[in-house]
Amino acid sequence: AECSVDIQGNDQMQFSTNAITVDKACKTFTVNLSHPGSLPKNVMGHNWVLTTAADMQGVVTDGMAAGLDKNYVKDGDTRVIAHTKIIGSGEKDSVTFDVSKLKAGDAYAFFCSFPGHSAMMKGTLTLK
């Protein structure tokens, strides 16, 4: 089973994919995020955040209030299944999470929680 994915977030506010499938044979799953653009993280920073589809908007709203120092993710937010830090031009970050946290048939969303980005930078994650 392929238990990781490489994703890029660019200066055009786009992720390189809008759908991720996690094989249920995987014990853990790793997301490797990179930023091929030229803009710094305070201007065009990106992260990768995973929640249920239902929780996405609330996490985005609370993340905006948390600010850049907290990677636009509220401290101790139990709705967040996994997240990377905010990265800028030329930077990378990875996150690994337990696949046991996912349920087959549930709808999951991944997105960038940098203010204003989630409308374009989002996708679905499915356990198969």
Swiss-Prot record:
Gene Ontology MF annotations: copper ion binding; electron transfer activity
InterPro entries: Azurin, BlueCu_1, BlueCu_1_BS, Cu-binding_ET, Cupredoxin
PROSITE patterns: COPPER_BLUE (PS00196)
Keywords, alphabetical: Copper, Electron transport, Metal-binding, Periplasm, Transport
GO cellular component: periplasmic space
SUPFAM superfamilies: Cupredoxins
Subcellular locations according to the entry: Periplasm
Binding site for Cu cation: 46, 112, 117, 121
Pfam families for this protein: Copper-bind
Coiled-coil annotated spans: none
Presence of keyword Glycoprotein: no
Domain Plastocyanin-like: 1-128
Function: Transfers electrons from cytochrome c551 to cytochrome oxidase.
Protein name, UniProt field: Azurin
